[in-house]
């Protein structure tokens, strides 16, 4: 796949519902993620190899393609929804339980529980004010939803996705996350420890992925930090003095629209943005635990296996030392001057 200058990647495959002016500009090159029918044998090969692909015709969430804000407001029920509120367009995830390790950490967004109607009011109020404040609903679908949503959910193409899961010996479906965002919202680059089918329902999202072997280009926060698994690099204003390897980053990108399903492999970094001036976006994630570790390990290890090892080392050291802040100095003492230059 040829490298491109980001937005220009889409000239040939442009969907009439959006154009390049709606994409944010970044400094790194990107390649196109293949767009294929789910019946195309190449799609199966990509998923088997844990490489991303956009599937255009799975009908995975077909009954949900009618979902919009009024329909959901009428039918989603009276449960509580997790809504993140941020001062700008970037919603950097953080683990509230890990905040105890970093007393000085100040989250860039806050999470509030509210009814769906309260979220809609808050979103419309924010849109009308035109200020910097933004909201993003991120809620696991649960049994508080109304009957019509349940009927839609049961009508998803479970036959197809269950076969995908079985073929690859993945673990169970852990959750279906409903995401409703304002135009221009950004979820900065991070990776998950689960397999993900990312089903777009309303509006368009640009998804930029990076393979696990670009770990050293993306500088994740330490495992004990609240922003574990998130990149420290600000894509809009990268600090190359602090993060010099980011100059070597190469992304894989696609814009997904209603009915598209993007396979995001486990441990692949992904940066997700709702298009500028593209209206509200609705997405449902299908998250699966990965396949169990094979009894016989094959060498050389794959990049994602090395990421898992690094995570385990950080976790073990944090527990052994009794203080996560001692992990970095100990690793530096171990490596500096010993492993960081060629040994004869």
Curated annotation (Swiss-Prot):
It is found in: Nucleus; Cytoplasm; Cytoplasm, Perinuclear region. GO terms for cellular component: cytoplasm; nucleus; perinuclear region of cytoplasm. Residues 133-303 form the JmjC domain. Its main location: nucleus. 2-oxoglutarate binds at residues 136, 187, 196, 205, 285. The modification N-acetylalanine is found at residue 2. The keyword Oxidoreductase applies. Pfam families: Cupin_8 (PF13621). It catalyses: L-asparaginyl-[hypoxia-inducible factor alpha subunit] + 2-oxoglutarate + O2 = (3S)-3-hydroxy-L-asparaginyl-[hypoxia-inducible factor alpha subunit] + succinate + CO2; L-histidyl-[ankyrin-repeat domain protein] + 2-oxoglutarate + O2 = (3S)-3-hydroxy-L-histidyl-[ankyrin-repeat domain protein] + succinate + CO2; L-asparaginyl-[ankyrin-repeat domain protein] + 2-oxoglutarate + O2 = (3S)-3-hydroxy-L-asparaginyl-[ankyrin-repeat domain protein] + succinate + CO2; L-aspartyl-[ankyrin-repeat domain protein] + 2-oxoglutarate + O2 = (3S)-3-hydroxy-L-aspartyl-[ankyrin-repeat domain protein] + succinate + CO2. Fe cation binds at residues 190, 192, 270. Its cofactor is Fe(2+). GO terms for biological process: negative regulation of Notch signaling pathway; negative regulation of vasculature development; regulation of vascular endothelial growth factor receptor signaling pathway. GO terms for molecular function: [protein]-asparagine 3-dioxygenase activity; carboxylic acid binding; ferrous iron binding; peptidyl-aspartic acid 3-dioxygenase activity; peptidyl-histidine dioxygenase activity; protein homodimerization activity; zinc ion binding. The record marks 331 as: Important for dimer formation. It comes from the Eukaryota. Keywords: Acetylation, Cytoplasm, Dioxygenase, Iron, Metal-binding, Nucleus, Oxidoreductase, Transcription, Transcription regulation. Its EC number is 1.14.11.30, 1.14.11.n4. Substrate binds at residues 143, 173-174, 192-194, 229-230, 291, 312. Homodimer; homodimerization is essential for catalytic activity. Hydroxylates a specific Asn residue in the C-terminal transactivation domain (CAD) of HIF-1 alpha. The hydroxylation prevents interaction of HIF-1 with transcriptional coactivators. Also hydroxylates specific Asn, Asp and His residues within ankyrin repeat domain-containing proteins. This is Hypoxia-inducible factor 1-alpha inhibitor. It comes from Danio rerio (Zebrafish). The gene is hif1an.
